[in-house]
């Protein structure tokens, strides 16, 4: 048994409080008393113990990408993102050939079957593409974009060991409505993204089960006073949980403030949407077979299109607090309990509560990650 003794902890339902947390693989006790029989993990005086971060949209890190399609590359991503406090994540794909997507799915199945205890936990897959709108492909390769195909999806899902948790698609394209119904029936989250959808398209999508918006503001129809598009609909409909890349590059600070003011506190989720260059020096990188130039925290294709981020989740939380003006615990919720609810794993992770998994990220006053713990095991220490 281990413990964090007499330190500041973000406790589920109680906010920030000085207490002692006793844990093994799961959280055993949260107490005001520090006279517990457990091995203390010493922390700095300014430490704050938070739930482990949950990243539902990340392509890669540490020089590896989920589309590389190997167990080894997934392991590198998992270990790299532990250093930013992430304890659970979805391996996120992109629009590619069926062969490459299937290869990536197979690697996820193999990795999860092996049940690695190193690095962040792979909860499943976020299938971003190929079922998107060509006109809003962003950094997704055009030649592999296709209309929603239930049989193709089922093949990918089977290859993954039924691990697909989210599918990004454009609801306005032919076949989308039946596809969303299928996803809803099997418990997979439909995320509206890479889309030119109008408000009416999104209303129809919500009616058959769509519940998430992929990297809100980016690669989607903008808000206009005569047609509010995807961005306006994301803010209008409380049924939609909105992902946001809070690096201040993909989305400006005022745009983030607008989103915060127009979404319920439990309907906004921080993502990194990071690509393989996260955690390694600037230079030339790759995304989906395309050359990416990484400089000063920005990843772009040759034509200037943003190609994912190199954002760390602890810095996303910091940006929301210090630049957007969100209360600290609310910003933490955006990176923990909100995505956990979307992925239907909030009974296990996403908050610090007796009986939940012992997943923690420990930050100092500068938002640096001091320690990351998953299932009671230290997976990163500064």
What are these regions (language model features)?
Residues 1-5, 9-50:
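Histidine-rich, glycine-flanked metal-binding segment
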Residues 7, 341, 351-382:
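C-terminal cap of metal-dependent C-N hydrolases
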Residues 59, 75-104, 120-133, 160-172, ...:
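Divalent metal-dependent hydrolysis catalytic cores, especially in the metallo-beta-lactamase
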Residues 79-90, 134-161, 204-216, 227-241, ...:
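Active-site gating loops and adjacent loop-to-helix segments of metal-dependent hydrolytic enzymes
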Residues 127, 183, 213, 320, ...:
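Conserved, mostly hydrophobic/aromatic
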Residues 154, 158-280:
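Active-site core of metal-dependent hydrolases
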Residues 232-242, 248, 260-272, 278-363:
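His/Asp/Glu-enriched, well-ordered alpha-helical/loop segment
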């Amino acid at each position: 048994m281990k413990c964090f003794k007499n330190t500041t902890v973000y406790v589920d339902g109680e906010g920030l409080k000085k207490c002692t947390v006793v844990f093994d693989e799961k959280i055993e006790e949260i107490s005001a008393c520090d006279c517990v029989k457990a091995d203390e993990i010493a922390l700095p005086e300014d430490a704050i113990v938070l739930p482990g971060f949950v990243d539902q949209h990340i392509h890669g890190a540490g020089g590896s990408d989920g589309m590389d399609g190997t167990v080894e590359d997934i392991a590198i991503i998992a270990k790299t993102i532990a250093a930013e406090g992430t304890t659970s994540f979805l391996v996120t794909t992109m629009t590619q050939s069926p062969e490459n997507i299937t290869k990536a799915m197979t690697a996820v199945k193999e990795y999860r079957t092996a049940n690695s205890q190193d690095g962040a936990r792979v909860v499943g897959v976020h299938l971003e593409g190929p079922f998107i709108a060509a006109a809003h492909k962003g950094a997704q390769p055009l030649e592999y974009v296709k209309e929603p195909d239930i049989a193709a999806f089922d093949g990918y899902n089977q290859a993954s060991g039924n691990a697909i948790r989210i599918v990004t698609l454009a609801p306005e394209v032919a076949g989308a409505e039946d596809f969303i119904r299928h996803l809803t029936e099997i418990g997979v989250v439909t995320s509206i993204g890479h889309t030119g959808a109008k408000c009416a398209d999104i209303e129809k999508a919500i009616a058959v089960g769509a519940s998430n918006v992929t990297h809100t503001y980016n690669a989607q129809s903008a808000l206009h006073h005569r047609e509010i598009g995807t961005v306006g609909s994301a803010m209008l409909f409380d049924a939609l949980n909105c992902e946001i890349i809070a690096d201040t590059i993909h989305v400006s600070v005022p745009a983030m403030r607008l989103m915060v003011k127009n979404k319920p506190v439990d309907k906004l989720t921080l993502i990194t949407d990071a690509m393989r260059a996260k955690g390694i020096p600037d230079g030339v990188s790759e995304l989906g077979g395309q050359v990416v130039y990484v400089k000063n925290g920005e990843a772009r294709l040759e034509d200037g299109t943003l190609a994912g981020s190199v954002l760390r989740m602890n810095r996303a939380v910091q940006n929301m607090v210090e630049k957007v003006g969100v209360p600290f615990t609310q910003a933490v919720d955006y990176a923990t309990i909100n995505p956990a609810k979307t992925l239907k794993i909030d009974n296990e992770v996403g908050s610090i509560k007796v009986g939940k998994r012992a997943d923690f990220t420990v930050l100092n006053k500068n938002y640096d990650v001091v320690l990351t713990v998953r299932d009671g095991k230290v997976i990163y220490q500064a």
